Amino acid sequence: MSEAITSARATARFVRVSPMKARRVIDLVRGKSVEEALAILKYAPQAASEPVAKVVASAAANAENNFGLDRRSLVVSEAFADEGPTMRRFSPRAQGRAFQIRKRTSHITIVVESQKEGAK
């Protein structure tokens, strides 16, 4: 039990962003420091960057408050978006038809790890 905890995670579930679009944004921040990741996400034009930024900030806060890790040494070690449940909606079309619209959701998970100052 002498091993110190060096990682923290945060998850946002049922986010109304398609997993494919969320993964585009997540790929930008994987492996970056938390400060750098938040700076990238702040100016990313994609709509998915806002919920991803919230999860990165939450993971950093979890590391800081729950495990006493230094925010400046945190790196996004793991980041992924899994598919959540799909909401099905119907769009009325001509001549009494109805087409199905799939509104996809994502479960976004970010893991941050404390890295030594000399590493990298």
Curated annotation (Swiss-Prot):
Tell me the subunit arrangement.
Part of the 50S ribosomal subunit.
- Cited function: This protein binds specifically to 23S rRNA; its binding is stimulated by other ribosomal proteins, e.g. L4, L17, and L20. It is important during the early stages of 50S assembly. It makes multiple contacts with different domains of the 23S rRNA in the assembled 50S subunit and ribosome. The globular domain of the protein is located near the polypeptide exit tunnel on the outside of the subunit, while an extended beta-hairpin is found that lines the wall of the exit tunnel in the center of the 70S ribosome.
Task: Provide the protein name.
Answer: Large ribosomal subunit protein uL22
From which organism does this entry originate? Corynebacterium diphtheriae (strain ATCC 700971 / NCTC 13129 / Biotype gravis)
Protein family membership:
Belongs to the universal ribosomal protein uL22 family.
**GO MF annotation, one:** structural constituent of ribosome
Q: Tell me, which GO biological process terms does this entry list?
A: translation
Record's Pfam families? Ribosomal_L22
List the InterPro entries hit by this protein, alphabetically: Ribosomal_uL22 (IPR001063), Ribosomal_uL22_bac/chlpt-type (IPR005727), Ribosomal_uL22_bac/org-type (IPR047867), Ribosomal_uL22_CS (IPR018260), Ribosomal_uL22_sf (IPR036394)
Assigned keywords, A-Z = Ribonucleoprotein, Ribosomal protein, RNA-binding, rRNA-binding
CDD domains cross-referenced by the UniProt entry: Ribosomal_L22
This protein's GO cellular component annotations are: cytosolic large ribosomal subunit
